[in-house]
Amino acid sequence: DDLKSPLDEEERSRIQVEENYTLIILDIPTIEERKGKEYFYTIPFGIIFTDKYIFTVCLVDSPVLTVFMDGRVKDFYTFKRTRFIYQMLYRNATMFLQYLKIIDKKSDEVEKKLHISQRNQELIEMLDLEKSLVYFTTSLRGNEVVLEKLMRNTSIPRYEDDEELLEDVIIENKQAIEMAKIYSDILSGTMDAFASVISNNLNIAMKFLSVITIVLTVPTIVTSALGMNVRGIPFANNPYGFWIVVGISLLMTLAAGAIIAKNKHFK
């Protein structure tokens, strides 16, 4: 069952000490590409520590381990098992920081597009990025609890150098939490600002249409009143009656427009 736990996407971060092994489950960041777009979210990553071996369990090929397999980690030795665990945790914390910087760059790109188009597509992209930041913040806080428990845990042997590395992991994780919070606040503020701009633009458009409707109503009323087929209509027998009616309509329309402009209805 413990081997299957990290395979559950909803599994929470925790540390579990048993008689023959210690289970550590943390959330790691990952990217999924759907319909040509990248989505950021987190998945569980399990580490099982026994007397002789270390097992890792994850739903996908984790980039946490890629750097170790490629030989890009300094002072990495398989026989230093405790240090190996802390190095994986450190790698995970730095991955969060890297992905947060990517999210920040993407939000800047989307913001530039919003300055030009203000389409629903850009707003949806901003919402997806904000959702990713919420996932990251929640996962990082869960990881923080596990790291603090790991600092007090004695089931995994630890040496002086290992303690320093674990402290570095905790510092990196706290930094990632702060960055996620800052980026989330900035993104929320940006979305609120653009929502206000869009709402203001809509109000201006509605006001403009209302003014146009009022102005165009004036000639309609004049021509309807003077165009009725009844006796006593002014200018009915005048050979220039049509042009007189047109002139009256035009003058009244200009007067209505001047009154509206004077009252600053466009502002």
Where are these regions (language model features)?
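Peripheral, non-transmembrane regulatory/ligand-interaction domains of membrane transport proteins
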Residues: 1-152, 156-159, 165-168, 172-179, ...
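Hydrophobic alpha-helical transmembrane segments and their immediately adjacent juxtamembrane loops
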Residues: 174-267
